[in-house]
């Protein structure tokens, strides 16, 4: 297998909040030999949802605790380049968004738009990798497909 084939087999998942509040083990499963990118808006949404008394609130709290524990064990360099997890990497996006490639009507304050743009940037910056947006939000999937993400 060539190096480019190996890179293509490795996937980069950009995750949305909806997947994390519906599947508590999503991060552990997705990082197995892959890279998971956690956009800053997802951290903000988890923070808002963690106080809910519903099952989604419980899952958000569980996910936030897992992320906190994972970050606590990571070095400063790993926080910058990706935290090793299950043979893959967990990367935290800083929240700074390059608006190059933003479309007419793009709203940087709308989490879905910011996450889709981030996935689009990862696709362009890492053409050798398969970049996949993971969400349970049908409207977000439709918007992402319209942007060829």
Predicted regions, residues:
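Active-site-proximal, substrate-binding regions of enzyme catalytic domains
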Residues: 2-132, 138-149
């Amino acid at each position: 297998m060539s190096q480019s084939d190996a890179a293509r087999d490795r996937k980069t998942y950009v995750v949305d909040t909806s997947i994390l509040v519906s599947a508590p083990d999503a991060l552990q499963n997705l990082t197995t030999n892959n890279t998971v990118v956690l956009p800053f808006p997802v951290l903000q949404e988890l923070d808002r949802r963690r106080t809910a008394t519903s099952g989604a609130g419980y899952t958000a709290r569980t996910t936030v605790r897992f992320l906190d524990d994972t970050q606590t064990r990571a070095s400063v360099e790993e926080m910058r380049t990706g935290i090793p997890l299950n043979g893959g990497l967990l990367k935290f996006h800083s929240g700074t968004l390059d608006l190059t490639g933003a479309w007419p009507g793009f709203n940087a304050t709308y989490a879905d738009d910011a996450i889709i743009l981030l996935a689009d940037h990862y696709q362009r910056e890492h053409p050798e990798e398969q970049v996949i947006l993971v969400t349970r939000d049908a409207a977000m999937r439709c918007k992402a497909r319209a942007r060829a993400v």
